[in-house]
Swiss-Prot record:
GO terms for cellular component: cytoplasm. Keywords: ATP-binding, Cytoplasm, Ligase, Nucleotide-binding, tRNA processing. The gene is tilS. It comes from the Bacteria. This is tRNA(Ile)-lysidine synthase. The N-terminal region contains the highly conserved SGGXDS motif, predicted to be a P-loop motif involved in ATP binding. Ligates lysine onto the cytidine present at position 34 of the AUA codon-specific tRNA(Ile) that contains the anticodon CAU, in an ATP-dependent manner. Cytidine is converted to lysidine, thus changing the amino acid specificity of the tRNA from methionine to isoleucine. It is found in: Cytoplasm.
Length: 430
């Protein structure tokens, strides 16, 4: 079956009819763009297609500007709208990982509802991905490599060229007289993928002609085995995970280590996080799940933090330490730090009404300076028939997790705490 006919059949089964093509300007994505342009013209068996393309300008090569221009010229030729997005690459975890993260986050910004991202990954890419997973010591999920349709970073992705080799794409490009750019970094064998592509895999393909197809079969077996595990554990998983970012630990400690790690991986996958290593999972189980009951353990996973409270795990973003932050309330609206939103105040004849998120509190007017602070460790009186008590006890009774307590705006009149907005008011001691 040729490329065009195969993709046409794939699109007949696809739920989306709007597609955003990831266009680098290289051979693979140029072929992909050409095929979709032809389908737009052909379409006897397809409903009308909405096609756009996006080029990510990483700024890592001196040729990056000329690549962007090439992509624009190509899209003008095919009459396909193009988005060119410049990104800053965070190299903390390596250029490859940083570029990939920046690329997908930029694409996510432009992907519309009901639109599907289309990438030009092919059979050779699949083999490379499998070997990279093997090098990392990945389990079934990692060795399952790429699927023709999947979800990544919360985006639906279609990879229609996954069943074709690079040689087949080259033959198509030459037949159609297509022009494409070549990224000079593809020859740099310091990068693992390039080392595999340029040094290792050619030797294997020379010895075994159908090596890529064999790898694809193995990857598919791994994917199916992982799906089977997920199916068998789905009922138990639902008992532990009824809220997406929360994982209940009831009965969890009684399971085998294999069952524990499988359920945790399902939870992390549900939240679209990259899979941790076996060492990291073991550390999470030992240092967080099996930590002492009174502890407030946490575990950092790239840009997320796993925390434990009242026998549940919670997934949050990393939070800034706001305990030394004091903000003077001098206007009706105050912008709070660390993405906490705005605190606003309205007044009537006798009172001030403070609003934050979905909460509000009404306090008497004052001539004292008003400030907003975060975190307090003293004693307060909240309940009329009880004496002053440690604020920690009040937070515990209200069921507020420790990491949230220092993120709730505290209203001070002078140096006197008056209220934790939305949670409690401080009463005068009798």
């Amino acid at each position: 079956m040729d490329l065009l006919s195969d993709i046409e059949k794939q699109l007949q089964k696809a739920t989306a009819q709007a597609f955003l093509i990831a266009l680098s300007g290289g051979l693979d994505s140029t072929v992909l763009l050409s095929l979709f342009a032809k389908l737009c013209q052909k379409q006897p068996h397809l409903p009308p297609l909405s096609i756009r393309a996006i080029h990510i300008h990483h700024g890592l090569s001196p040729n990056a500007d000329s690549w962007a221009k090439h992509c624009q010229d190509l899209c003008d030729q095919f009459q396909i709208p193009l988005i060119i997005e410049r990104v800053q690459v965070d190299k903390t975890n390596g250029i490859e990982a940083g570029a990939r993260e920046a690329r997908y986050q930029a694409i996510k910004k432009y992907l519309q509802t009901q639109e599907m991202l289309v990438t030009a990954h092919h059979l050779n890419d699949q083999t490379e991905t499998f070997f990279l997973a093997l090098k990392r010591g990945s389990g079934l999920k990692g060795l399952g490599a790429m699927q023709q349709q999947s979800v990544l970073f919360g985006m639906p992705i279609l990879r229609p060229l996954l069943g074709f080799t690079r040689t087949q794409l080259e033959n198509y490009a030459q037949k159609e007289k297509l022009n494409w750019i070549t990224d000079e970094s593809n020859e740099d064998n310091r990068y693992d993928r390039n080392f595999l592509r340029n040094e290792i895999l050619p030797e294997l393909r020379e010895r075994w002609a159908h090596f890529d197809l064999a790898v694809q079969r193995s990857a598919q077996h791994c994917f199916e085995q992982q799906q089977l595990i997920n199916d068998l554990l789905s009922e138990i998983f639902t008992e532990h995970c009824q809220i997406k970012n929360q994982f209940k630990l009831c009965q969890f400690r009684q399971y085998s280590l294999a069952k524990q790690t499988a359920l945790l991986r399902m939870w992390l996958a549900e939240n679209q996080l990259e899979m941790p290593s076996k060492r990291q999972l073991t550390q999470l189980i030992n240092d967080v799940i099996f930590a002492k009951e009174e502890a407030n353990p946490q575990f950092q996973l790239v840009n997320k933090v796993i925390r434990r409270y009242q026998d549940s795990l919670y997934l949050t973003k990393p939070f800034s330490d706001l305990t030394k932050c004091t903000l003077k309330l001098e206007q009706n609206t105050l912008n709070l730090p660390d993405d906490l939103g705005n605190l606003t105040v309205q007044e009537n004849e006798h009172n001030l009404i403070f609003y934050w998120q979905d909460y509000s509190v009404t306090l008497e007017k004052t001539n004292l300076p008003i400030s907003i602070r975060f975190g307090y460790s003293g004693k307060v009186k909240h309940y009329p028939k009880r004496p002053r008590e440690d604020i920690k006890k009040i937070w515990q009774e209200l069921g507020v997790p420790p990491w949230e307590r220092n993120r709730i705006p505290l209203i001070f009149y002078g140096n006197e705490l008056k209220s934790a907005v939305g949670f409690f008011r401080v009463l005068k001691s009798s």
